[in-house]
Amino acid sequence: MAKKIKKILAVTGIRSEYDILFPVIDSLRKHKSFQVQLVVCGAHLSDWHGDTLKDIESDKFDVVEKIDYLLMTNRKTQRAKGIGNLISSLTQTVDRIKPDFILYVGDREESIACSIVANYMNVLAVHIGGGDSVYGNADDPIRFACSELAHVHFTTSQQYADNLIKIGEEPRRVFFSGNPALKNIKDVPSISKKEISKKLDFNLNKYAVIIKHPLSSSKEESYYQMKTTLEAVGEFSKERNIEAVGIFPNTDPGSYDILRAIKEEESNSM
């Protein structure tokens, strides 16, 4: 009798988590025992965040659903309302696709939505990135909840695997796999500083990289925190004679305020 092919429904909502997910689903789709399908949602469908759906499509995955649930209101209500919309749409997709596993990463809206839908629809939930911790943000308890609701766990460090076992997860379901994104770093062709400098249009002999995301516990402070950060980096850069490059924030409430501070700094330096 032929062995049944297992359906894996992977869910991705932002480029940072797709970077972790990619090596896993890329390997799985090459295995004759698995059929890999993707749900693409969230920031991937946002022009403001680079419309990264096109990158996923260029990777030639079978995208079975695009869920545009992101509410860019810059208010505390946006993530909770967005999760509700995502759960509703994802439930319909799971009912249609009927996967054997739902595969997801981390601690964002997609993660908790996958955890809830998988459990209520009797589908095995496979979670990557549990056991980690972050302070001052909703992501920490959300990640913990995802771990409690997941059936199989892949952690990025042995310490995180131990953390899951300490909170009661069965050791036989917890696997220390390392961070899959390390494979991407290994596989990316090397590029010289000269080439990067030309692309970014500044000197990379001495440089600093700045990135700041808003905290859910201090959303109202986001603008002032970023202004203070930029002032400090500006002073430091002048003292040390280095260049600084900034990266835009994520989609969380407060991100518009951080972006406003960046745009103001950009205007002042022109």
Give the label of every model feature segment.
Residues 13-14, 40-43, 130, 179, ...:
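Cofactor-binding loop segments of dinucleotide-utilizing enzymes, especially the Rossmann-like FAD-
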Residues 37-42, 153, 243-250:
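Short internal beta-strands
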Residues 12, 45-47, 149-222:
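A nucleotide-sugar donor-handling region in carbohydrate enzymes
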Residues 5-6, 206:
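Nucleotide donor/acceptor-binding cores
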Residues 35-79:
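Conserved nucleotide-sugar phosphate-binding/catalytic loop shared by glycosyltransferases and other
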Residues 7-12, 18-29, 69-171:
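Active-site and donor-binding regions of nucleotide-sugar-utilizing enzymes
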Residues 191-270:
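Donor-nucleotide binding loops and adjacent catalytic segments primarily
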Residues 31-37, 62, 239-244:
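A generic structural motif
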